[in-house]
Amino acid sequence: MTNIRKTHPLMKIINNAFIDLPTPSNISSWWNFGSLLGLCLIMQILTGLFLAMHYTPDTSTAFSSVAHICRDVNYGWFIRYLHANGASMFFICLYAHIGRGLYYGSYMFQETWNIGVLLLLAVMATAFVGYVLPWGQMSFWGATVITNLLSAIPYIGTTLVEWIWGGFSVDKATLTRFFTLHFILPFIITALTATHLLFLHETGSNNPTGIPSNMDMIPFHPYYTIKDILGALLLILTLLTLTLFTPDLLGDPDNYIPANPLNTPAHIKPEWYFLFAYAILRSIPNKLGGVLALLLSILILIFIPMLQTSKQRSMMFRPFSQLVFWTLIADLLTLTWIGGQPVEHPYIILGQLASILYFLLILVLMPTVSLIENKLLKW
């Protein structure tokens, strides 16, 4: 008798995606982050659902409803901080996943890569609108500053900003629509994730060598299910440690002050995971130029497959490319640090240098070094 998991229409999909899926035998722990992102998404949807049961998207009660969740709802504080720190874990996994893709040449699966970039944009949008919901000082001013950037668009800018605000400033209408968007976007992300997996399973996974591994495949279960469970346990341990010991470590103290349109915080800054892009935005004195640089800092990922000049897919055997890659990581960490600093000397010039280096590394140095390595192969 044939196994039900191989015949039943629904079970067959699950079987082909998570059980009998042929997987390269040599993929490392860097391939764990895909499943961890799935876990983060499920966790965020569940904690978000319970928070939405008690939250009120109204300017007069939003802040106190979050306080009510933390004080009066059973384990409300736990759910709230799991959700807030879960977002941080989500972005850590996301950036590690993208870094893995860059290092091992996974971007050569173009459809999978492009849907991944769309997913990144959707997650960033979700995190941004979600940060506005507690209606603290940083929520309000973050929303005001970032939405205001759209006014840099010629002709339609001002109209567009007022259309997003639903008025002439960030107010009740803005909060309501941001809550709506924050609720719907995770489901769009889930649909995109399914598409991402669909395209990945058309080609099969890449592996650390970048060499086709069709002749050396093993079933996903039990080998990689157990490996993913280990990753999941480490993720949960890290998240629980963060949530139970230092829940506010990654947050901003200003967000414990109710939103006040008449009082601007000394340093307006987004959550840590947007700081690198914020530093690039601030490093250009011109408003439109800054907005374009901000957009390009993320959308540059779409052009990565076109910039591939190496004869080898992975960086595993390319020491010079590895050097450029780790310089890029160091540069991104520098930008993240600068994004959290006030706009004054020496941070301004450091931010400008780090921003120039960011684009230089991706657009010029990576392709050039790859060409040099191609020449070295012939020696």
Curated annotation (Swiss-Prot):
Q: Indicate yes or no for the key word Mitochondrion.
A: yes
GO biological process: one example: mitochondrial electron transport, ubiquinol to cytochrome c
Alphabetized InterPro entries for the sequence: Cyt_b/b6_C, Cyt_b/b6_C_sf, Cyt_b/b6_N, Cytb/b6-like_sf, Cytochrome_b, Cytochrome_b_C_euk/bac, Cytochrome_b_N_euk/bac, Di-haem_cyt_TM
Name the positions where a ubiquinone binds: H201
Manner of cofactor binding, per the entry note:
Binds 2 heme b groups non-covalently.
Residues holding heme b b566? H97, H196
The entry assigns this protein to a family as follows: Belongs to the cytochrome b family.
Q: What else is known?
A: Heme 1 (or BL or b562) is low-potential and absorbs at about 562 nm, and heme 2 (or BH or b566) is high-potential and absorbs at about 566 nm.
- Identify this protein by name: Cytochrome b
* UniProt source species: Pseudorca crassidens (False killer whale)
